[in-house]
Amino acid sequence: YLMIESLTVTNFYCFKERTTILFTAKKERNRMLDNNFCGFTTQNKINILKLVFLLGNNGAGKSKILSAFDALQYLIAQIRERKDESLRYRPFAFDEECLNKPSEIEIVYHINDSRYLYSIKWDKYAIYEEILDELRTKTNINLFHRWYDKVSDIVKVDFTDKIQVSDNENYIISSSLLKNNSVFSTIIKTNISHALLNSHLLFFMEGFEIVNLEDVDLNEELPDDKTENSKQLKNVICSFLKSVDTNIMSYEKLKIDVEYPAELLQKLKSL
C-alpha cells in the first residue's frame, strides 16, 4: 500500500527557499465533504489525503512543484551510461548564488506499514547526496547514505546494518555507482534483487504518474446543462469548486463570436 505524505523542494525552478506540499489531513475536517470527495486514509497513524487541490494564480508555481515528481523519476529510474552525461537541472534563476548550488527534493512516503524519507541533491554535473531513512515514532533510522566528493571525484555509499545489504551487493553497487546515477538506477543497471530496495524502486517507478492535460479542450469537455448526465457532472464540479473555497457557485458555457480588427486582417492579407 503506497501513499505520499509530503513533498519538499529547494532551489528548484521558481522555488528558491525550502517549500513543502503536505498531503496530510488537518484535524478540522468536514466529514460530509470528506465522504463526497474521497477523504483521507489512515496509515501508520497519519491521516493522508486521497485527493489534494493546488490553487494559485498563473505563474505561482503549481506545475513547477508537481514537476518535482517527474524529476524524481528521471533521477532515480533513468540510467546514465557515462559519468560525463549532464543531468536535468533547473535551479532558481534569479539569484546568482542559487545557480551554483544543488537543487534538492525530499519526499516522505509510506510503503505498507513503514514510513520513509528519501532526499536527493544534484546539479547538472552530479548527484551530490542521497539519503534513505525509515521514520519511526521516536527516532529516524538511516538505511543508506550516498555522497559525492567533488574535489576527489569519488562517489561513496554507506548501507547500514538495518537494510541488510550483503557484502557482494554492496560491492556491486559501490563499484558501479557513477556520480550522475542514483543508488536506485544503479540497482536497475546491475539487476540486483533486494526485497526492500526493490520495493522503493517500484514506488518511484510506479507509485505516481504525471498526466499532461494541455490538450484537453474545456469547451468540448466541460459539462453543461443540456443532458441529465452532464447536469450531474456539472454539479460534482461545482461542489469541488465550492469545497476548496473558490467562491465559484456555478458556470455557463457561452459561444463568443470573435471579431478581428480590420487593420489586423489587412496586415495578415499583405503578409
What are these model-predicted stretches?
Residues 17, 63, 74, 128-129, ...:
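Short catalytic/ligand-binding loop motif for oxyanion handling, primarily in non-cytosolic enzymes
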